[in-house]
Swiss-Prot record:
The N-terminal half of the protein mediates transcription repression. Keywords: Nucleus, Repressor, Transcription, Transcription regulation. One of its GO terms (biological process) is negative regulation of transcription by RNA polymerase II. Transcriptional repressor. It is found in: Nucleus. Disulfide bonds: none annotated. Residues 1-104 are annotated as: Transcription repressor. InterPro entries: MBD2/MBD3_p55-bd, MeCpG-bd_2/3_C_dom. It comes from the Eukaryota. GO terms for molecular function: methyl-CpG binding. Highly expressed in testis. Detected at low levels in pancreas. Not detected in the other tissues tested. One of its GO terms (cellular component) is nucleus. This is Methyl-CpG-binding domain protein 3-like 1.
């Protein structure tokens, strides 16, 4: 009887103890510093002031190395909501910067991008002049050699897919037969109970 009352007391004490993650004390940053540093809690209510150390005020915000990668795959729309094509790019840039007197606006923009984010140079071709007729050849990011897919390439790929599917079908049939044979062996090894 005494043991059960001691257990009840112990259980009550354990329930009354607070959980380690729900502490109301100021949390301490556990790091390689000799002294533990207090952590500023940021709560999502308005009017909360976030305190900074003096050395934190002089820190610069991190910058993205290649910001234009975020823009890949995005479509440009006009103010009317119509999809803009790549052929309108040169005209749009000329409208935005009508007083520009340099050689080629797109070349200067692309060279600025290349200096801000070094990317591997792609194979250039004169076919890209057809994409942007108003601009010259020399923009490495916009003048990529086109990859043409021929009917022969499609037929070769279809043949490869067909042979792989046939091999997969044969493998599935063989696996099913092996499973059935294993079941038969298991049933022969154990006599049936009646």
């Amino acid at each position: 009887m005494a043991k059960s009352s001691q257990r009840k007391q112990r259980d009550c004490v354990n329930q009354c103890k607070s959980k380690p993650g729900l502490s109301t004390s100021i949390p301490l940053r556990m790091s390689s510093y000799t002294f533990k540093r207090p952590v500023t809690r940021i709560t999502p209510h308005p009017g909360n002031e976030v305190r900074y150390h003096q050395w934190e005020e002089s820190l610069e915000k991190p910058q993205q190395v290649c910001w234009q990668r975020r823009l890949q795959g995005l479509q440009a729309y006009s103010s009317a909501g119509e999809l803009s094509s790549t052929l309108d790019l040169a005209n749009t840039l000329q409208k935005l910067v009508p007083s520009y007197t340099g050689g080629s606006l797109l070349e200067d923009l692309a060279s600025g991008l290349e200096h801000s984010c070094p990317m591997p140079h792609l194979a250039c071709s004169s076919d890209a002049v057809e994409i942007i007729p108003a601009e010259g050849v020399g923009i490495s990011q916009l003048l990529c050699k086109q990859f043409l897919v021929t009917e022969e390439d499609i037929r070769k790929q279809e043949g490869k897919v067909k042979t792989v599917r046939e091999r997969l079908a044969i493998a599935l049939i063989a696996d099913g037969l092996a499973n059935e044979a294993e079941k038969v062996r298991d049933q022969e090894g154990r006599p049936e109970k009646r």
